[in-house]
Amino acid sequence: MYTYKAKLDRIVDGDTLDAKIDLGFDITVHKRIRLAGINTPESRTRDKEEKKRGLAAKDALTVMLEGDNVNNYFILESESVGKFGRVLGRLHIKTKEGEYCINDQLVKNGHAVEYHGGKR
């Protein structure tokens, strides 16, 4: 397991984002991150109900990373890259109430379900 500081570039959907990852020694890379262990509804679909839930998940992720976050960064824990070339990771942030894992919070709030690969 590797741990990095990262800053948000852009939120793609409820379980995917682009970020600038600090590798140390003033070396940074811009990568797409897929939140590991969870799956959110798709926000780019013709199914209007799924799209509505997908946009709600994206909004929840936005609030956590941009609104609740007291630092300008989050902590990325990652051990691998997925089959589509995205970094698979768990995100942690610090808020006024304490620290928490974004992946777990999305599941707890009903915006995501646990997912560990395979058929959805």
Each model region followed by its residue ranges:
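Small beta-barrel nucleic-acid-binding modules, primarily SNase/OB-fold domains
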Residues: 1-120
